Amino acid sequence: MQYISEIDRLSSYPSIDTEVLRTFVAIADQGGFTRAGEQVNRTQSAVSMQMKRLEEDVLQRKLFERDGRQVRLTPEGQVLLGYARRILKLHSKVLNTS
């Protein structure tokens, strides 16, 4: 029952929705919030608000360096990007398993 106690311990952390991760990956891939919004069918404003909540409320870490319309990932953002890609890949596998 070690797994149950581990899950209970981890449940105190905030959760991150897969749609937020998908948006985060789109920003990294597209290099900006507007193009990422087009990819995930959201407005630039909605994408911006999602990422602000992720940075400030959930992770309490800066994920992006913003230079005008250009966006680059911080070192913390690079780490999250690797995890996000893996999580989304696993999520897709789970949903496609019969």
Locations of regions flagged by a protein language model:
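A short LG(V/I)-centered, amphipathic sequence patch enriched
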Residues: 55-73
